[in-house]
Amino acid sequence: LDNRLTYEDMLKICETINIHYIPDEQLFYDTIDHILENPENESASEIILETFTALLKLIDSQIKEIETKVNIQPSCFKGCAYCCYFPIITTRLEAKLILQYIQSLPEEQKQDIFEHLLNYFESNKEQLEKVCSIDFHEDPQFKFKYISEQVSCPFLDRSSNTCKVYEVRPTPCRTYLNYCHPNVCAQSLMPRETFSYEFLHEFYMTALNEVLQEFLYEDEDLGITFPDDVFHIDYLPKLLKEEL
């Protein structure tokens, strides 16, 4: 007997989460206050990167806390990459911070990721031009059209179906989870059973924005254009290619 959650179960759980378990935004402010008061790094760019990674970890911990409260566990597992073909829309700021994170990695790992990205953009050039031209503002079918082309995320290692920047993967990736049978993702390009904690994104971006403003007038070149990079959103592959 398979007692996995159904779509109907998820509708009820979703309602419960929305009514009772939306986290307090103050948690995100407390995190940035702690970093600003006790920074592990000295330079402004390093503190911003430290904040970026800390806020992403906070998103993960908040999701786990909600899961505990409503007694659910994701059926996602390492090596399952169906959602890694979804359109990831993010800010230019986040794309820049992901690249800064890669730059901070050990030399061998850093070179491996950059070589992977260059190969990715070269081998998927025509498909990327096609999918990144889909208007996600105006076209209600943009997600389906994008997924139908089966262009993987720039950071997906297709040999292992794992993420090369898992620790700093964008919020659409880390907030999208399946709690029903794992087959639902295999059987549909856009399964209705999946759940997104996208409400956490606003808390995270607001807190990150607050930290940026702390360092706007520092002498150090942060490589960030404020506020443009915060508000400019586009497909992740397009932003990464422009910033490489």
Q: Where do the PLM segments sit?
A:
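Short loop/turn segments that flank or connect secondary-structure elements
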Residues: L1-L244
